Each structure stands twice: as structure tokens, then as C-alpha cells.
Amino acid sequence: MDENKIKDAVRMIIEAIGENPEREGLAETPDRIARMYTEIFSGLKEKPEEHLKKVFTVNNDDIVLEKDIQFYSMCEHHFMPFYGKTHVAYIPNGKVVGLSKLARTVEVFAKRLQLQERMTVQIADSIMDYLKVKGVMVVIEAEHMCMTMRGIKKPGSKTVTVATRGIFKNKIEFRNQVYEMIKMK
């Protein structure tokens, strides 16, 4: 990531909106934003397979669900945050992954300029491809600041996206079971 280009661009934006980039409250803002972007876009340097390669053998073909994985991401259309919860369910095919690895996989894709719809598919595809599971279902529920702060201004509205692969694609009873598990306290 080119932090110097980010700093220059932020200075230009500050000037373009009619502010003084040298005034006390703004003088260090380009540096802060460059450091922040390095952090919040760190998923661009990571690959999901780095987190999905360590598996454990099991004799289980029941649904595994990691729910309420909190995330934040940045909308690529408006450069504004969206945030919420991801629920990842899969049916093992003789192997499971450590639960933290599912959350790390979510992070890899969330820490990029993103569309929620694409992120949902990317998470599902990576789990299907690298874990070779019988099926995977990913549900993401998120609030988009571009809907809250600008445009239509509807705070509290949520977007829900779902991606299903393998056995979840054709078996509504498995999808319904995941929805019921997500509702559990």
C-alpha cells in the first residue's frame, strides 16, 4: 500500500472541500488516514487459504455453525463503512477447521473495498474450495452507512445476503435448520 499517495490524496480532498490542511485539527489527518487504510484494507495482502489449511479429522457430518461473527468493511461505491454479523455454516467431509479460522476468513474478505453481495460469495467459495466440505452456507446481515448518512438516510435498515454451496444449495431443510440455529440465543 502506498501511504504517501494516500496522504497526498487526503490533503487534496481537505483542500477541495475548502478546508486548510495545515490547521491544528487537520495537520495530522493525512497520516492518520494512511495508517488507518493500511489497517482496514489489510485483507488485500492476505489469502483465505492461509487460515483454512490447518484441519482436524472428525467423524461427523452434522452442521457446524459459527454465528454472530462481527465485521466491518468499506463499501467500494461510496468509501463508507458497512458492518454487521456473518454466520458461517458448513457440513464437514471428514475434516473441520478451528472455529477462529472461520472468523479470520471473514476478516480477509471484509478488510477490502467490498460489496456485501460479493463478500458473501467469496467467503462461501473459499470454504467450499479449501475445506472440501459437503456444503456451506453464509449469511451476512449488515448496516450500510451509505444508506444511513447520505442518500435515502434510513438508519437501522439492514441488508441480508446469503450464499449456499454444495448440499445447502438443493436441500431446503438444511438451510432452514441453519436459519433456526442462527435465531438461537
Swiss-Prot record:
Residue ranges the record marks as coiled coil: none
Bilayer-crossing regions: none
Catalytically driven reaction(s): GTP + H2O = 7,8-dihydroneopterin 3'-triphosphate + formate + H(+)
One GO term describing the cellular component: cytoplasm
GO molecular function, one term: GTP binding
Keyword Hydrolase among record annotations: yes
EC number per UniProt: 3.5.4.16
The keyword Hydrolase belongs to this UniProt entry's keyword annotation: yes
Keywords in alphabetical order: GTP-binding, Hydrolase, Metal-binding, Nucleotide-binding, One-carbon metabolism, Zinc
Domain of life: Bacteria
NCBIfam families: folE, PRK09347.1-2, PRK09347.1-3
Subunit structure: Homomer.
Family to which the UniProt record says this protein belongs: Belongs to the GTP cyclohydrolase I family.
Protein name: GTP cyclohydrolase 1
Source organism per UniProt: Clostridium kluyveri (strain ATCC 8527 / DSM 555 / NBRC 12016 / NCIMB 10680 / K1)
